[in-house]
Design a protein with these regions (language model features):
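Selected transmembrane alpha-helices and immediately adjacent juxtamembrane segments
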Residues: 1-40, 126-177
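Residue-level signature of the transmembrane alpha-helical core
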Residues: 10, 14, 18, 49, ...
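Selective hydrophobic functional segments
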Residues: 46-106, 188-238
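Transmembrane helix exit motif
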Residues: 58-68, 89, 106-131, 242-253
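Hydrophobic alpha-helical transmembrane segments in multi-pass integral membrane proteins
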Residues: 87, 91, 143-153, 191-199, ...
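Membrane-interface alpha-helices at helix entry/exit sites of multi-pass transporters
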Residues: 39-48, 72-76, 170-181
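Residues within membrane-spanning alpha-helices of integral membrane proteins
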Residues: 6, 49, 104-108, 112, ...
């Protein structure tokens, strides 16, 4: 691998850390960069998980120090996410990405329309929506459903978690993003363990990228905390549009 390719990967890792810390979707930058460098898809996914687990943990710590974390959801969902994502990573070899991409594209378009048509969504918390049944639903959706998807494919996991917690629990975007980071740690760890046992992780490269991912994540989390829910909403819509575009290109190009 050339020096230029290494520099591109490090820059992509920093950008991915920033995006992941704000709304998720950093894989949009990291995964293509890894594959353009000539790394096979499975190894690229595995190395992406290694880098991301450090950045996501950094973002989570930054959020926890400055905002309220929904521990009633984050802790059980995060624990379940380790198992669910691991199962997803195991199933990844049997499920074609071509089958999942159109479904994910439709869901992302629905998310974009939903957020666009509801400008007040996620701007302020709505605690009156919270019930025990909704807490259980949020844990199941985040810790099982979305986590399993992250193990199989991944794009949009953080975004899906934020939308789920905002819609189901009435959290604002900043608190939803903070809570999502804990589940994201679980999904990254679960998938990383499976990929590591299968020998797909490029450890030296992944750890080098992790340093830049940490820097980007720290900056992204601080910006989200400083600029608030409106900033997170704008970045979320931009990232969703970018994800739909990339998935469409992969599917139809």
């Amino acid at each position: 691998m050339s020096l230029e390719q290494v520099v591109v990967l490090l820059v992509a890792a920093a950008g991915a850390g920033w995006v992941d810390a704000v709304v998720g979707g950093g894989g949009l930058l990291q995964l293509p960069a890894l594959m353009v460098a000539g790394i096979p898809p499975v190894q690229a996914m595995a190395t992406n998980k290694l880098s991301s687990v450090f950045g996501t943990t950094t973002a989570a710590i930054t959020y926890v120090r400055s905002t309220k974390l929904d521990r009633q959801v984050a802790i059980p969902a995060g624990a379940l996410a380790v198992l669910s994502s691991g199962l997803g990573a195991t199933a990844a070899v049997a499920i074609s990405a071509e089958v999942l991409r159109p479904v994910v594209m439709v869901v992302l378009l629905g998310v974009a329309a939903f957020v666009t048509l509801r400008p007040a969504m996620g701007q302020v918390p709505k605690p009156h929506l919270r019930t025990n049944a909704r807490v259980v639903a949020a844990v199941a959706v985040g810790g099982v459903g979305i986590a399993f998807y992250d193990g199989i494919m991944g794009p949009g996991t953080g975004t899906f978690l934020i939308i789920a917690f905002t819609t189901i629990l009435g959290l604002d975007f900043v608190n939803a993003s903070a809570t999502a980071k804990i589940i994201n740690i679980g999904t990254n760890v679960g998938a990383l363990v499976v990929f590591g046992l299968q020998g797909h992780v490029l450890w030296t490269l992944g750890l080098g990228m992790a340093v830049c991912n940490i820097a980007g994540a720290r900056l992204g989390a601080r910006m989200a905390l400083k600029r608030g829910a409106s900033f997170v909403r704008v970045v979320l819509l931009i990232v969703v549009a970018a994800m739909v575009t990339r998935l469409a290109w992969q599917q139809f190009a």
